[in-house]
């Protein structure tokens, strides 16, 4: 009785955030279309992908570790000591992170060329020079993305999920508009500037500037203690997230001697990351404060129910995603990207690599929720240890497989260690909470497989038609078919989604 209303509320919040995330991904995809058309997989595109990797790694490391430590400490501080102390803690962390990342940005700009030379040994001198030029612009992402991640976590603690999604939507709109305006004539330099400006806009829109300057942030002993606790909880996360965040740097290092491979892997990785974000990010964001609250209350029944609901939701999303990417990646990439300087060979390589990254999508989605469970227990060491072991295995496999198998070997190694990590984490959670965390997952899996098979059949039929961009028509028709089959099979998540859109009709139909 307690769980179902909460699950309905979570689904509504997840749906709103997922729709906003879908808008962001749509804009990011427009940018990918422009890049594919104007630059394909040529050397300038290699330079852009290489230059953006380190800033994204650093900002992802700082934002991910600090945000994951911030949420449980902020929620606990607000509940036990008061909202004023929690507010002061948050503003102090924003100030410290601003100072640290601004200093890091300036140091990185001055060391741009030696840094790029070390990270990309396969580049010649001209490629190193060009990559360093772009890196000087893109290195500002270390500041804006890190601060944006902390601001996002702060808003999520107050349930302001739509605000953060809307801010990212506006920021991506700025990036696409500026790239569209200047990219064709100004080249990759204008693209880099557009990306940096978009990140700044996203951060600026999420901060409560008026309240900060009007309310201030009284520094007290309690708030300083909360800041120290947050930083101490963050330290193990830095090590653990370093594994995931350093993974792209290792990939760039291994592929730098292969012309075009960095760009091809970049396209596939960004598409996989977009799918991963769409499938898990909204759910993890909404569920994390609830998980932290149940853990703080030591209510294992509610915690178990929240985890089971999240796993059922992810199962319903991931099964059709895997079906689409394994069987229909090639026609999708062909219809979406193959134009301008993006060739048929690029389509073949990118689609094969994307299909091989399905393990990353599944493991990353389930791992996002699993890690949040440990963080809600204020246990950051266990995910770190698992991540270190998994990354070590993955790195060894990459060095072993890159020579005989190229990009496919790298993608397979990445998928393997992501899946290994999540299997271990879910196993440990089940040992502590019991098999109740998997309640209803098997039934959801069966329904998702049946629905995905029906959707794949419809998509295959449309691929054989003469429609323009048949894969897109097939994806749309397959999605509708999947929803219809799930409703007919009385899947609870599907019915709740229908009730959200048609509340009166859905209740009458089910009664």
Regions found by a protein language model. Give the residues of each.
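Membrane-embedded alpha-helical bundles of multi-pass transporters/translocases
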Residues: 2-511
């Amino acid at each position: 009785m307690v769980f179902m209303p909460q699950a309905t509320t979570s689904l509504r919040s997840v749906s709103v955030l997922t729709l906003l995330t879908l808008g962001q991904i749509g804009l990011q995809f427009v940018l990918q279309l422009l890049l594919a058309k104007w630059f394909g997989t040529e050397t300038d595109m290699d330079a852009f992908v290489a230059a953006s990797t380190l800033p994204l790694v650093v900002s992802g490391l700082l934002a991910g570790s600090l945000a994951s430590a911030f949420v449980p400490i902020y929620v606990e501080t607000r509940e036990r000591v008061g909202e004023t102390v929690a507010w002061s803690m948050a503003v102090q962390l924003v100030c410290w992170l601003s100072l640290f990342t601004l200093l890091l940005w300036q140091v990185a700009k001055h060391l741009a060329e030696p840094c790029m030379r070390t990270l990309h040994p396969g580049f010649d001198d001209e490629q190193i020079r060009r990559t360093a030029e772009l890196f000087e612009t893109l290195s500002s992402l270390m500041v804006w993305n890190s601060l944006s991640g902390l601001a996002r976590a702060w808003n999520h603690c107050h349930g302001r999920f739509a605000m953060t999604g809307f801010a990212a939507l506006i920021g991506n709109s700025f990036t696409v508009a500026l790239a569209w305006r200047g990219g064709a004539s100004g080249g990759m330099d204008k693209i880099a500037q557009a990306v940096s400006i978009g990140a700044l806009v996203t951060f600026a829109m999420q901060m409560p500037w008026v309240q900060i300057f009007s309310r201030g942030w009284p520094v007290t002993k309690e708030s300083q203690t909360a800041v120290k606790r947050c930083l101490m909880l963050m330290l193990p996360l830095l090590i653990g997230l370093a594994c995931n965040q350093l993974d792209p740097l290792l990939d760039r290092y291994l592929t730098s001697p292969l012309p075009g491979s960095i760009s091809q892997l970049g396209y596939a990785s960004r598409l996989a990351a977009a799918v991963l974000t769409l499938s898990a990010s909204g759910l993890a964001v909404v569920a994390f404060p609830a998980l932290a609250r149940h853990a703080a209350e030591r209510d294992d029944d509610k915690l178990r129910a929240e985890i089971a609901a999240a796993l059922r939701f992810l199962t319903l999303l991931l099964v059709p995603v895997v079906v689409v990417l394994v069987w229909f990646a090639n026609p999708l990439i062909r219809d979406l990207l193959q134009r301008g300087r993006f060739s048929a060979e690029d389509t073949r390589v990118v689609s094969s690599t994307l299909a091989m990254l399905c393990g990353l999508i599944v493991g990353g989605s389930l791992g996002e929720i699993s890690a949040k469970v440990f963080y809600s227990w204020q246990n950051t060491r266990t995910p770190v240890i698992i991540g270190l072991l998994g990354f070590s295995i993955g790195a060894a496999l990459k060095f072993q497989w890159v020579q005989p198998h190229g990009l496919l070997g790298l993608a397979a190694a990445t998928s393997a260690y992501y899946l290994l990590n999540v299997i271990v984490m879910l196993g440990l959670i089940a040992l502590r909470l019991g098999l109740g965390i998997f309640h209803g997952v098997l039934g959801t899996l069966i329904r998702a497989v049946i629905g995905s098979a029906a959707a794949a059949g419809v998509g295959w039929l449309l691929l054989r038609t003469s429609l323009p961009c048949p894969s897109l028509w097939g994806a749309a028709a397959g999605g509708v078919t999947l929803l219809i089959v799930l409703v007919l099979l009385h899947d609870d998540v599907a019915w709740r989604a229908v009730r959200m859109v048609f509340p009166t009709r859905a209740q009458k139909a089910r009664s």
